[in-house]
Amino acid sequence: MALPSVTALQVENVAFPPTLIKPPASANTLFLGGAGERGLHIQDKFVKFTAIGIYLQDTAVPSLAVKWKGKPVDELTESVQFFRDIVTGPFEKFMQVTMILPLTGQQYSEKVSENCVAIWKHLGIYTDEEGKAIDKFVSVFKDQTFPPGSSILFTVLPKGSLAISFSKDGSIPEVESAVIDNKLLSEAVLESMIGAHGVSPAAKQSLASRLSELFKHHAEV
């Protein structure tokens, strides 16, 4: 099917192109579903740490439109189930996390791990297998440092693998740095960004707004 026609997005000084050809571990071209910053309020000031871009396989639009076309953007933005359907849907996803402020690999992986474990415990699905996957996830980041402008890249494959890659200069590498075969981890990394307690409300708003428009066009086909 034809790739949805979407625009590029800019978050701070990070540009996310409208399409991504064959990200690491994938043979597909993905489109930019949405983007936004992750930040925290520190002493009455909103400090932005990372810019997050979320790309989706073209089949995401018909897959999600069945249930969600015709719903207003604010309803999609507030719907936990809508984002859960993106997280668990049978299509590839790619997340680019680009640093606005510097972070170490340890800082990043520990925070993401915490969020993933919290999600699993809330859903009642935390097992030894997930514990091992988290250990591997943390070890992949152990020796990494991320100055401003560098990126962490995740490819989520529908069969349950999470490919992790790194870029220091904004380019997308052809080959992944590591693959972790754990479906719940691959889903939880994305859920930690856009789920019920996701770290980027701006990315959620962007996804809801852009996908809502794409659903309208899909309905006309």
Swiss-Prot record:
Q: Determine if Repeat is one of this entry's keywords.
A: no
Q: In which pathway does it act?
A: Secondary metabolite biosynthesis; flavonoid biosynthesis
Q: Which reaction does it catalyse?
A: a chalcone = a flavanone
Family annotation (InterPro entries): CFI, Chalcone_isomerase, Chalcone_isomerase_3-sand, Chalcone_isomerase_bundle_sf, Chalcone_isomerase_sf
Q: Which UniProt keywords apply?
A: Flavonoid biosynthesis, Isomerase
Q: Please indicate which residues carry the site annotation Important for catalytic activity.
A: Y108
Name the Gene Ontology biological process terms.
flavonoid biosynthetic process
Instruction: Answer whether the UniProt record assigns the keyword Zinc-finger to this protein.
Output: no
GO MF annotation terms: chalcone isomerase activity
Source organism superkingdom: Eukaryota
Listed EC numbers:
5.5.1.6
Q: Which SUPFAM superfamilies match?
A: Chalcone isomerase
Residues that hold substrate according to the record = T50, N115, S192
What is its biological role?
Catalyzes the intramolecular cyclization of bicyclic chalcones into tricyclic (S)-flavanones. Responsible for the isomerization of 4,2',4',6'-tetrahydroxychalcone (also termed chalcone) into naringenin.
Q: Which family does it belong to?
A: Belongs to the chalcone isomerase family.
Other facts noted in the record for this chain? Part of the biosynthetic pathway for all classes of flavonoids, a large class of secondary plant metabolites, many of which are brightly colored.
Question: Per its record, how is this protein called by name?
Answer: Chalcone--flavanone isomerase 2
What is the taxonomic lineage of the source species?
Eukaryota, Viridiplantae, Streptophyta, Embryophyta, Tracheophyta
